[in-house]
Swiss-Prot record:
Cross-referenced InterPro entries: Ig-like_dom (IPR007110), Ig-like_dom_sf (IPR036179), Ig-like_fold (IPR013783), Ig_C1-set (IPR003597), MHC_class-I_related (IPR050208), MHC_I-like_Ag-recog (IPR011161), MHC_I-like_Ag-recog_sf (IPR037055), MHC_I/II-like_Ag-recog (IPR011162)
Keyword Transmembrane helix: yes
Signal peptide: 1-19
Species of origin: Pan troglodytes
Binding site for a D-galactosylceramide: D98, D169, K170, W171, T172
Primary site of residence: membrane
Positions annotated as glycosylated: N38, N60, N126, N181
Keyword Transmembrane among record annotations: yes
Record-given protein name: Antigen-presenting glycoprotein CD1d
Ranges of the Extracellular topological domain: 20-301
Taxonomic lineage of the native organism: Eukaryota, Metazoa, Chordata, Craniata, Vertebrata
Length: 335
């Protein structure tokens, strides 16, 4: 009986432990791409992501930031939102002008490509961190740190001259500080409140197996497809029993059109070693009921196995207690 109680406790711990979901954070990341074909032709486009969801876009042909979600304005009033958009319009105009002036002063050759990544992340307890990075021709050259602009270690020498000029502009530096330290965390907090249901949604993955192109004579490429899951973090491994196959090659996690994700994991094995292999999928939406697909077509779920074990253990406990009670009753009758 003690052994049965131990097994029951173990099964419960397995079920509870596998259902733990780490706390998620949702950084706001604003991305900007600016192209300068020459001194007279320029284009700047932008978009913003909150965690894994795209929330805003800004076309070069528009003066208005487009909201892609019903809750994209967060808890900002219409006046606050319009003020923020006005700041962005001034920023885009100033950015274009300044780049042209720097190109002339530093004798940079067209075409020019600049990328900007800026935003913030709000943590529990209202703590936050922020970032503002600038890349030139695809390579990071400078960032905003605290109260001023600083070059990266790999930045060209001319970046130091540009930073000297930028740091002399006190109004711009103070505006950047205000946006990063105050406005951004406030805006993100409002987005998290307004978009809570969509941000915290859980969509279960679907998984299937296939055979990929042969890696060579006598070998198989086993492919495990996992699609339609949200949020993005997922764990996929080829297994032999409970042993992870370290040669599993996961691909990139790619977006689907419906804002869910797709991943495939491959394993190159000898044809005679494919039997007994399985693909295991862990995701927060499964609540501990991992998907296991066996090479050869069978399917099972760890959660169902745990439930079956629990049911059997409970049945054995009931039978054991009932049998013991009957024996005690019969002994009392004899006495």
């Amino acid at each position: 009986m003690g052994c049965l109680l131990f097994l029951l406790l173990w099964a419960l711990l397995q079920a509870w432990g596998s259902a733990e979901v780490p706390q998620r954070l949702f950084p706001l990341r604003c991305l900007q791409i600016s192209s300068f074909a020459n001194s007279s032709w320029t284009r700047t486009d932008g978009l913003a992501w909150l965690g894994e969801l795209q929330t805003h876009s800004w076309s070069n042909d528009s003066d208005t930031v487009r909201s892609l979600k019903p809750w994209s304005q967060g808890t900002f009033s219409d006046q606050q939102w319009e003020t923020l958009q006005h700041i962005f319009r001034v920023y885009r105009s100033s950015f274009t002008r300044d780049v042209k002036e720097f190109a002339k002063m530093l004798r940079l050759s067209y075409p020019l490509e600049l990328q900007v990544s800026a935003g913030c992340e709000v943590h529990p307890g209202n703590a936050s961190n922020n970032f503002f990075h600038v890349a030139f021709q695809g390579k990071d050259i400078l960032s905003f740190q605290g109260t001023s602009w600083e070059p990266t270690q790999e930045a060209p020498l001319w970046v130091n001259l540009a930073i000297q000029v930028l740091n002399q502009d006190k109004w711009t530096r103070e505006t950047v500080q205000w946006l990063l330290n105050g406005t951004c965390p406030q805006f993100v907090s409002g987005l998290l409140e307004s978009g809570k249901s969509e941000l915290e949604k859980q969509v279960k993955p679907k998984a299937w197996l296939s055979r990929g192109p042969s890696p060579g004579p006598g070998r198989l490429l086993l492919v495990c497809h996992v699609s339609g899951f949200y949020p993005k973090p997922v764990w996929v491994k080829w297994m032999r029993g409970e042993q992870e196959q370290q040669d599993t090659q996961p691909g990139d996690i790619l977006p689907n059109a419906d804002e869910t994700w797709y991943l495939r994991a491959t394993l190159d094995v000898a044809a005679g070693e494919a039997a007994g292999l399985s693909c295991r999928v862990k995701h927060s939406s499964l609540e501990g009921q991992d998907i296991i697909l066996y090479w050869g077509g069978s399917y099972t779920s760890v959660g169902l196995i745990v439930l079956a074990v629990l049911a059997c253990l409970l049945f054995l406990l009931i039978v054991g207690f009932t049998s013991r009670f009957k024996r005690q009753t019969s002994y009392q009758g004899v006495l």
